[in-house]
Curated annotation (Swiss-Prot):
PTM annotation, UniProt: Glycosylated.
Quaternary structure and partners: Homopentamer. Pentraxin (or pentaxin) have a discoid arrangement of 5 non-covalently bound subunits. Exists as a dimer under reducing conditions.
Domain Pentraxin (PTX): from-to ranges: 6-27
InterPro entries per record: Pentraxin-related (IPR001759)
Region of interest (Disordered), ranges: 1-27
Cofactor(s) the protein requires to work: Ca(2+)
Superkingdom as given in the UniProt entry: Eukaryota
Coiled coil feature spans: none
Protein name, UniProt field: C-reactive protein P1
Note: Shows sequence similarity to serum amyloid P-component-type pentraxins but binds to phosphatidylcholine.
Length: 27
């Protein structure tokens, strides 16, 4: 897994950055 902004956002907990995760991962 590349240590890019996208990767970091995906790995970050949803509770931590729900907004960021939503932007990166479409529901």
């Amino acid at each position: 897994i590349p240590q890019d902004l996208s990767g970091k956002m995906l790995t970050f907990p949803k509770e931590e950055d729900d907004d960021d995760v939503k932007l990166m991962t479409p529901k």
